[in-house]
UniProtKB/Swiss-Prot annotation:
EC supergroup of this enzyme: isomerase
Localization terms from the record: Cytoplasm
Gene3D superfamilies documented for this protein: Diaminopimelate Epimerase, Chain A, domain 1
The entry's keywords: Amino-acid biosynthesis, Cytoplasm, Isomerase, Lysine biosynthesis
Active site as annotated: 73, 217
Main location: cytoplasm
Subunit text: Homodimer.
Protein known as: Diaminopimelate epimerase
UniProt-annotated site: Important for dimerization, residues: 268
One Pfam family it belongs to: DAP_epimerase
Cysteine-cysteine disulfides: none
Gene: dapF
A GO MF label: diaminopimelate epimerase activity
């Protein structure tokens, strides 16, 4: 199998062209490849497939390091756009892709940055999915170590966002897995910990579903800003500082699509025997 190793702000991926290669991945194979000591090592594997819809350019699949398939990854989407361009699979500047849960437009800007139309945030609890009687801007979540207030939203994948006073001392290591596996999120959840610096700037750490805490989570940054805007804490354009670097997130409110802008880096190409 030929592959590329890439990262978006330190959130690292193996990207595979399944258009020119005939490949099948079992969860066990993905877990073996994800092993940082015995395999390649990655947070997620991204698969480039032919489009299911003639009006689109590609189909985009995402697998966690534990072998589970997920519906969305914002940092991965930027790497996906960089990969299909570098490999000559398209010469378009605006690339239309489908995912498990919807469609996305990946735009390569003149300065090389990649701007992703992430679509509209989804707030309806049943569609996140999240167990609640109705939408609220804040929900009370009880865990074995503390009770937290969180916002819940889907960016094509489920997120809960907790505001913290200090990102450095936030209890991500213990609280992250408790939120990820909370019974009110039947498909598990990505847990974001957000410190508001001012209305146009936040700091964020994300404990990702199936991957643990990562250097950066693009959809998590989108979710944090969406929740912050909805709660009246943030303006429509926000710089999000993650451990691996910064993203710009723009959202003008309900009924509008959300945009994420950031970089994507190609590290190396490789071949591995399956």
């Amino acid at each position: 199998m030929q592959f590329s190793k890439m990262h978006g702000l330190g959130n690292d991926f193996v990207v595979v062209d399944a258009i020119t290669q005939n490949l099948y991945f079992s969860p066990e194979t993905i877990k073996r490849l994800a092993d940082r000591h015995r395999g390649i090592g990655f947070d997620q594997m991204l698969i480039v497939e032919p489009p299911y819809d003639p009006d689109l350019d590609f189909h985009y699949r995402i697998f966690n390091a534990d072998g589970s398939e997920v519906s969305q990854c914002g940092n991965g989407a930027r790497c996906f756009a960089r990969f299909v361009t570098l490999k000559g699979l398209t010469d378009k500047k605006d690339i239309a892709v489908s995912t498990q849960t919807g469609k996305m437009i990946l735009s390569i800007k003149d300065d090389g940055m990649i701007r992703i139309n992430m679509g509209e945030p989804i707030w309806e609890p049943a569609k996140i999915p999240f167990t609640a009687n109705k939408f609220e801007k804040n929900y009370i979540l009880r865990t074995s170590i503390q009770t937290v207030l969180c916002g819940a939203v889907s960016m094509g994948n489920p997120h809960c966002v907790v505001q913290v006073d200090d990102i450095q001392t936030a209890n991500v290591e213990q609280l992250g897995p408790l939120l990820e596996n909370h019974e009110r999120f039947p498909e598990r959840v990505n847990a974001g910990f957000m410190q508001v610096i001012h209305r146009g700037h936040i700091k964020l750490r994300v404990y990702e579903r199936g991957a643990g805490e990562t250097q950066a989570c693009g959809s998590g940054a989108c979710a944090a800003v969406a929740v912050g805007v909805m709660q009246g804490l943030l303006d429509s354009k926000v710089q999000v500082d993650l451990p691996g670097g910064s993203l710009i997130i723009e959202w003008e409110g309900v009924g509008k699509p959300l945009f994420m802008t950031g970089d994507a880096t190609h590290v190396y190409d490789g071949v591995i025997r399956l």
